[in-house]
Amino acid sequence: MDITIRQAVLRNFLGNSPDWYKLAIIAFLIINPLVFFFVSPFVAGWMLVIEFIFTLAMALKCYPLQPGGLLAIQAVAIGMTSPHQVAEEIANNLEVLLLLIFMVAGIYFMKQLLLFIFTKLLLSIRSKITLSLAFCVASAFLSAFLDALTVIAVVISVSVGFYTIYHHVASNHSDKDINDDSWIDSQENRKTLEQFRAFLRSLMMHAGVGTALGGVMTMVGEPQNLIIAKSAGWHFGDFFMRMLPVTLPVLCCGLLVCILLERFKLFGYGAVLPERVRQVLTDYDKQASAKRNRQEKVKLLVQALIGVWLVIALALHLAEVGLVGLSVIILATSFCGITNEHALGKAFQEALPFTALLTVFFAVVAVIIEQSLFTPIIQFVLQSSPSAQLSLFYLFNGLLSSVSDNVFVGTVYINEARKAFELGVISLQQFELLAVAINTGTNLPSVATPNGQAAFLFLLTSALAPLIRLSYGRMVYMALPYTIVMTGVGLLGVEYLLVPVTEWMIQSGWISLPHIAAGVSITH
């Protein structure tokens, strides 16, 4: 059937997104200039921020790059901000872009080692409580040094691999679609498959929360951490020590929640690996190990050594994070024999869409700076007592991060806090404490929904989610106990532990104030 040009344009616009979503974006693009020119630039700026948060919240309807990018282009075109201001924001945060481009790609070439580690964990530990704890701890440790997206991508790869193996055995057809259960005729096999799905769901959620628990602790754990660390003038060790008064209690309580959920089988947790599935997977692993030749074993050893280099380089701050990632790419590809251009290109596919989206974030941040959108909120917070400021920053960050992207929220708030310091409104010591409150507030409560954590969103939109019946609602439900405990313990840490423990560490010589002075631009 022939369609009109108008229908064709509407169908092409934002692809398979729902019509109501397309019309909402078109309405935003029509209303924004009218409000900017005829009502108030300040109101138009806030409308842009709310609309951009809306595109992030609707990430499952349409990837936010396209609608958010259209809104950002229009904002620059009508004069909400200038191309120069956008370029300046991008230049200020070049380190973060390099982290996403090179570090994620670098870890892609270490996937063999990470797959090997998680496979051995899954098959060698029989106790579900111990296994869940191991996955959570392993994800937390890896996310402290690697990118959380990459860690969750590896766990997804392992889970999809195992699911595929068992599905083929259960259906007696290795060539059938793993999304099709109609070939599994035995009721017992179907029951086993459902239990296996529940088992994988719980492991994936533990691993996802583990990336948040570890990611908050170091400056490379999450992209926004690097922005906050740069603004405060902290290196790897400084950042880790500064966060410890809040992150250590949260880590301990998070792991305790993991144990309790599995022990009492709450919130959809507690399913064990069916013995039949374990046998199938163990047999497969034995065959794979027997086929592994010396060349492949050497590759695993090389990747382990590169992992050691990565940890040392980050801990001693031997180079900028992105450059360390580039060194990982060069070392891993050189010594593992990956020299084909197309094989190299695959490593960059995961990170580049998010890198482009982050660049759009910076355009919206430029609007916020140009129009002074957050100034009233910051002034309200800064009028309260210094101790109340910390809790308010933590809560405001947490609330926004649970519905929006935490990179965006963290960037906005640290810029505003830095501006207050440069104007002499707050002291250097208070600015540093606020930086801790912003970082923890941005990272911890954001596990509430997939919108807040990039790793959770990646899991929800992955090929694994429909296989194990992991929906948006189920993710929110399974994350709820973690959200309550991590947010609550984080708030108590900011309120009661942060100031005294930080002062004690300064007196003990464990940390010192960085050499940044009021009036110096954030770019330096």
Swiss-Prot record:
The keyword Aminoacyl-tRNA synthetase does not apply. It catalyses: 2 Na(+)(in) + 3 H(+)(out) = 2 Na(+)(out) + 3 H(+)(in). GO terms for molecular function: sodium:proton antiporter activity. The keyword Membrane applies. InterPro entries: Na+/H+_antiporter_NhaB. It comes from the Bacteria. It is a multi-pass membrane protein. GO terms for cellular component: plasma membrane. It is found in: Cell inner membrane. The chain crosses the membrane at residues 23-43, 45-65, 98-118, 136-156, 203-223, 239-259, 304-324, 325-345, 358-378, 392-412, 420-440, 448-468, 479-499. It holds the Pfam family NhaB. Keywords: Antiport, Cell inner membrane, Cell membrane, Ion transport, Membrane, Sodium, Sodium transport, Transmembrane, Transmembrane helix, Transport. HAMAP family: NhaB. Belongs to the NhaB Na(+)/H(+) (TC 2.A.34) antiporter family. Na(+)/H(+) antiporter that extrudes sodium in exchange for external protons. PANTHER family: NA(+)_H(+) ANTIPORTER NHAB, TRANSPORTER ARSB-RELATED. This is Na(+)/H(+) antiporter NhaB. It comes from Yersinia enterocolitica serotype O:8 / biotype 1B (strain NCTC 13174 / 8081). The gene is nhaB.
